[in-house]
From Swiss-Prot:
Keyword list, A-Z: Cell inner membrane, Cell membrane, Membrane
Family listed: Belongs to the UPF0161 family.
Topology relative to the membrane: Peripheral membrane protein
Pfam family, any one: YidD
Organism: Campylobacter curvus (strain 525.92)
Subcellular location: Cell inner membrane
Function description: Could be involved in insertion of integral membrane proteins into the membrane.
Disulfide bond recorded as keyword: no
HAMAP family documented for this protein: UPF0161_YidD (MF_00386)
GO CC terms: plasma membrane
The protein's name: Putative membrane protein insertion efficiency factor
Amino acid sequence: MKNFALSCIKFYQNYISKILPKSCRYYPTCSEYAVWEFKNNDIFSALLATLARILRCNQLFKGGIDYPVIRKRFGSFSIFKRMEFSNIDFWFVPCKNSKFYVIKVLDSLKEKR
């Protein structure tokens, strides 16, 4: 279901958004916000957060920087356990109790392998 939602958003970004004027009042844009939510949250929470964001994106709200906030629990860390590293796509910046801001790593900063 997540993949279907992500493919719908990508279709919107690639085909529909290109012909419409830029009107989003926030950074990241509402469609990019939705992609980040669906990649890092469960489908129900992502859908609610995306809907709330789209409803806030109008002239009655100031706009500005509005990163997604998700709940995330990280596994335990041990210096004796071997860790596998892959490319980092998102940074999780602490916000409140087990809540984190989601910030995407710029493509130019990603390590080329």
